[in-house]
Design a protein with these regions (language model features):
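Extracytoplasmic metal-acquisition and chelation regions
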Residues: 2-15, 22-297
C-alpha cells in the first residue's frame, strides 16, 4: 500500500534492547529442528508462510508475523513476542526490497539471518518493484530454496520435501497457463500503482502510465500534464483497462475509476495483501483468471 514510508527507528531500538535480554536467557545453539521435532519457519507475511506450509508439510512448524490482511507491512511494528519466535526459528523469510525491512532488523537483533526473497532468491535490487508475489517466478525460486534448505536440515525427509515442492510448482504452472490467455490487444494498461505490474508483464501487457505510478510510489503528486494525458486517453478508450488497487486509493484514482466506467473502459480490481483465510494458490488463480477474463471484454 502506498503510504508514507515512516521508519520506526526509536521503536526498533527499544525493541532490540528488550530482545537482547531475551536472547541472553536463551540458548545460542543452532538446532536443525524445534523442540517438537519439526523445522521452525517464521515468515513476515502469510504469502510466504502459506507456501512454506505446503512444502514443509507435516515436518514443518510455520508461522507468519503478520496474520491479518488489513495490516500494512510497510508500517508494521513487531513486538517482543515476535522476536521470541525468531529466536526459535530455523528458517526466517522476508519479502525484501524494502517492503518489510523491520523483519531483517528484528532477525539481526537476535543474531539470526533472514532470507530476503527479492534480493537473495530473485536477485533483484533496491528500487525494484517489491510486489514480487504477483511474479510467478517468485514461488518457483522460493519453493526450490525451501526444498533445498529443508532437506539439509532434515535429510531423512528430503524425498518428501521434494515431492511436495514438485506438486506445488505444478499448480503454479497451471496458473501461468492462465496468464498466457491474456493480452489480445496492443493497447496499454493504466494502473493506480505498481502492485500488479508483474502479473501484467506475465500476461504480455504494457503499463502506459509509468509517470503516474512512479509518482504514487514515491509519494508525490503526479503532474497536471500526466493527469490530463491519462484523462484524454481514458475518454478516447486508448487503453485496454484500468487496474485499481482497492486497498490504497486517492481522489485522483477514484476519479479515473469513475471516468473509466463512464466511458466503457474495464476496471480490474486487485489488492496488495492476501485475503484472510485464502491460500496463495487460490488468490493467484483468482487474480490471473480475472486478468484473462478482462482481456476478452
Amino acid at each position: 500500500m502506498q503510504k508514507s514510508r515512516i521508519t520506526h527507528y526509536f521503536f526498533i531500538l527499544i525493541l532490540i534492547g528488550a530482545v537482547m535480554l531475551l536472547v541472553s536467557a536463551c540458548s545460542n545453539k543452532q538446532k536443525s529442528t524445534s523442540s517438537n521435532g519439526k523445522v521452525s519457519i517464521v515468515a513476515s507475511t502469510n504469502v510466504y508462510a502459506d507456501i512454506a506450509k505446503n512444502v514443509a508439510g507435516k515436518y514443518g512448524d510455520v508461522q507468519a508475523v503478520i496474520k491479518n490482511s488489513a495490516t500494512d507491512p510497510h508500517d508494521f511494528e513487531p513486538t517482543t513476542a515476535d522476536a521470541k519466535n525468531l529466536t526459535k526459528a530455523n528458517i526466517i523469510v522476508a519479502n525484501g526490497l524494502g517492503y518489510d525491512s523491520w523483519m531483517n532488523k528484528l532477525a539481526s537483533s537476535v543474531n539470526k539471518k533472514t532470507v530476503l526473497v527479492g534480493e537473495d532468491l530473485m536477485h533483484l535490487k533496491k528500487g525494484d518493484n517489491p510486489h514480487i508475489w504477483y511474479n510467478l517466478n517468485m514461488p518457483t525460486k522460493y519453493v526450490n530454496y525451501l526444498v533445498k534448505r529443508l532437506s539439509k536440515l532434515q535429510p531423512k525427509h528430503a524425498v518428501y520435501f521434494k515431492a511436495n515442492g514438485q506438486k506445488y510448482l505444478a499448480k503454479i504452472d497451471q496458473i501461468r497457463k492462465l496468464a498466457k490467455r491474456g493480452n489480445k490487444t496492443d493497447k496499454p494498461v493504466f494502473v493506480s500503482e505498481p502492485v500488479f505490474d508483474y502479473a501484467l508483464e506475465e500476461a504480455g501487457y504494457k503499463v502506459g502510465d509509468k509517470d503516474f505510478e512512479k509518482a504514487v510510489q514515491n509519494g508525490t503528486d503526479p503532474s497536471p500534464k500526466t493527469i490530463n494525458k491519462m484523462t484524454k486517453e481514458i475518454e478516447d478508450k486508448k487503453i485496454a483497462f484500468f487496474v485499481n488497487n482497492t486497498q490504497a486509493s486517492s481522489s485522483t484514482v477514484k476519479t479515473f475509476v469513475k471516468l473509466a466506467k463512464k466511458n466503457g473502459v474495464p476496471v480490474l480490481s486487485v489488492r496488495e495483501t492476501i485475503p484472510n483465510h485464502t491460500t496463495y494458490l487460490d488468490w493467484m488463480k483468482e487474480n490471473y483468471q480475472n486478468l484473462a477474463n478482462i482481456s476478452k471484454k
